Amino acid sequence: MIKQSEEEKDLLDVEFFVLGQAVNYLEHAHVVVRRLSEHHFKSENHKNIFLLIRDILRDRDTISISLIWEEIKRRNLDKSMDVSYLIHMSQNADIPIDLDHHIDFLHEKHVNNLLKEFLDSSFQDFTRYPNRRSPYTLIDQFKERLDDIYEKTSYPRRKHIGKTVYDIFSSGENGKASVIAQIRHRYDYRSRHKIDYVDGLPTGYSSIDEHSIILSRGNFVVIAARPAMGKTAFAIDIALNLVLEQGKAVGFISLEMSPNQIVERIISNLSETSCEQLKRGNFSRDVLSKIESIGTKLKGTHFFICDNKSTDLNTLIDQARELRENQGIDALFIDYLQLIGSSKKAENRQNEIAEISRQLRKLAVELQIPVVCLSQLSRKVEDRGDKRPMLSDLRDSGQIEQDADVILFLHRKDYYSQEATKGLSEIIVGKNRHGSVFSTTLRFNSCTGKFTIQKEAW
């Protein structure tokens, strides 16, 4: 028989006393179940007793030795423990203990065990593949695992939970200005400039911006559509509006096109010359002069395109952080979500996309800039009579719908119907966490990828 260490004996004693309190006192049982899980117990018998107490409390608001013992027998657990063990546990609960302190002890032991496992496996990963992985990729993977440990082991603490509404109203939170200070600043701005204060970046399309500012700091924005609707063109158009009209810095990461192809799209947009003409050299000398002058227009602007040879999520996140830190980008565009690969093993592609979506949302919040990601829609759109997209059409994962702050759909009637008015694109804001949902119409030149304000009726 293996002799127990003093440390292990102390741990089992604490488990024993904590469960004894839960067996004897209903209010203590609720505290134990709320703040611990079966993973906090080393002894298998203690794990089972905890789970039994939890299940009993879900069905009724009472606890007793007899109820626990009935459940033990019903689940055929009486071979590994006797009713005398429960009685002994209950009798020892009369000894006064600091329940909060003992719960904290179990929690810290559990976290220490997870950290030890993490450090051991991380060391093995590091030594198994020396110099074969980017150190930054490893750092991101380690950070991801630590974040997982933190999320899994966070639990309701007994003190200092939350801040009062008045505290946030008057003094803010996490280093931010107070709510009243922010509201006062917006009022002063409106009074001084006689125009509305904009808490974010404009898209450059008044029919969108007058309804809602979708490019707010920390927003995860998804532009979704079926192929040929103009997703990439719309993203480039918004990026150009930010760079040329607002003087902002923008990052563009494309997993689908090379930097040269993106720049050709930009030239087509600004010169109003079709991409096909540019490819064939089929344009006049005047058009060539116009194209050459675009270089002067773009000189000194801050439109950064990443030459992304990897589709790995961690690499993409590294690039985004570097663009924010070194180039000071005000917005990031990613084309497109379904081409991103995750380093985490997932049961299926749907779960992988869900993880990518969660990480992109976290990235937007971390960098405090709008992260605009393009996304495909499923073929279900084609099965409907009007072909009009909706949230359930988001491809591969409903998690995108949950994570995104704003979801915009692009819909072109003329793509599906010869009778529809040519050159119109409906922009549908299907989700807007901080504003209203609406739709508007823009003119779209599919040859140049240029979107413009639509004055006439849809």
Curated annotation (Swiss-Prot):
Residues given in the record as ATP binding sites: 225-232
Domain called SF4 helicase: residue spans: 194-458
EC identifiers of the protein: 5.6.2.3
Recorded GO MF terms: ATP binding; ATP hydrolysis activity; DNA binding; DNA helicase activity
Catalytic reaction annotation: Couples ATP hydrolysis with the unwinding of duplex DNA at the replication fork by translocating in the 5'-3' direction. This creates two antiparallel DNA single strands (ssDNA). The leading ssDNA polymer is the template for DNA polymerase III holoenzyme which synthesizes a continuous strand; ATP + H2O = ADP + phosphate + H(+)
Domain of life: Bacteria
Pfam families per UniProt: DnaB, DnaB_C
GO-annotated cellular components: cytosol; primosome complex
A single GO BP: DNA replication, synthesis of primer
PROSITE patterns (UniProt xref): SF4_HELICASE
Keywords: ATP-binding, DNA replication, DNA-binding, Helicase, Hydrolase, Isomerase, Nucleotide-binding, Plasmid, Primosome
Family assignment from sequence similarity: Belongs to the helicase family. DnaB subfamily.
Role according to the record: A replicative DNA helicase, it participates in initiation and elongation during DNA replication. Travels ahead of the DNA replisome, separating dsDNA into templates for DNA synthesis. A processive ATP-dependent 5'-3' DNA helicase it has DNA-dependent ATPase activity.
Subunit-level organization: Homohexamer.
Name of the protein this chain belongs to: Probable plasmid replicative DNA helicase
Native species: Chlamydia psittaci (Chlamydophila psittaci)
